[in-house]
């Protein structure tokens, strides 16, 4: 019997295949190379630690499979600016469309709205998504160990940008 996570990963594989058909790995790699250097996600956390402060990675999420719509009036750029004003250390942006109603466009528009380091929170299963994350403004990505084999984890780490 397929678990819910297995279903999500199968859907993600189809989505990534569609994205690759629309924009090649070479094209997205080029966009990633042309994008701004990443902001220091870990450096931001270390700086807070050195100041004796707690780091907060604030999440921007419209919905979840278990809770449904979390925030009906969802203005991701405004939420990001509010978090920045309240001194969040970094932001975590949900980009999975099918199950969390996220979007890469949220990541891109938030990048243009705030100066904080951004984490793309998605089900990363392919190197394409690493370059895509950078091209859309992410400073780091989430890798979920339970969906990756040791080999695929090592392969994805080899494509750090």
Residue ranges and their predicted role:
Residues 1-107, 112-115:
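Conserved N-terminal beta1-alpha1 strand-loop-helix module at the mouth
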Residues 87, 114-116, 135-141:
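Glycine-enriched alpha-helix->loop->beta-strand junction motifs that scaffold or abut catalytic
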Residues 94-95, 121-122, 143-146:
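Short beta->alpha connector loops at strand-helix junctions that form conserved
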Residues 100, 149-150:
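Short glycine/proline-centered loop/turn elements that form peptide/ligand docking sites
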Residues 116-126:
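Glycine- and Gly-Pro-enriched alpha-helical subdomains that act as flexible
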Residues 127-132:
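Catalytic cores of alpha/beta
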């Amino acid at each position: 019997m397929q678990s819910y996570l297995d279903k999500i990963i199968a859907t993600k594989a189809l989505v990534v295949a569609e994205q690759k058909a629309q924009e090649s790995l070479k094209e997205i790699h080029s966009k990633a190379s042309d994008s701004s250097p990443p902001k220091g996600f870990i450096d931001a956390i270390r700086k807070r630690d050195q100041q004796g402060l707690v780091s907060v990675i604030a999440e921007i999420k419209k919905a979840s499979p278990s809770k449904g719509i979390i925030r009906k009036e969802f203005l991701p750029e405004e939420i990001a600016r509010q978090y920045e004003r309240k001194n969040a250390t970094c932001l975590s942006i949900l980009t999975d469309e099918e199950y969390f109603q996220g979007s890469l466009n949220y990541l891109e528009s938030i990048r243009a709205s705030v100066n904080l380091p951004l984490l793309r929170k998605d089900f990363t299963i392919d190197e394409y998504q690493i370059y895509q994350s950078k091209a859309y403004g992410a400073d780091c990505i989430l890798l979920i160990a339970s969906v990756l084999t040791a080999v695929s984890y090592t392969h994805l780490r080899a494509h750090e940008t």
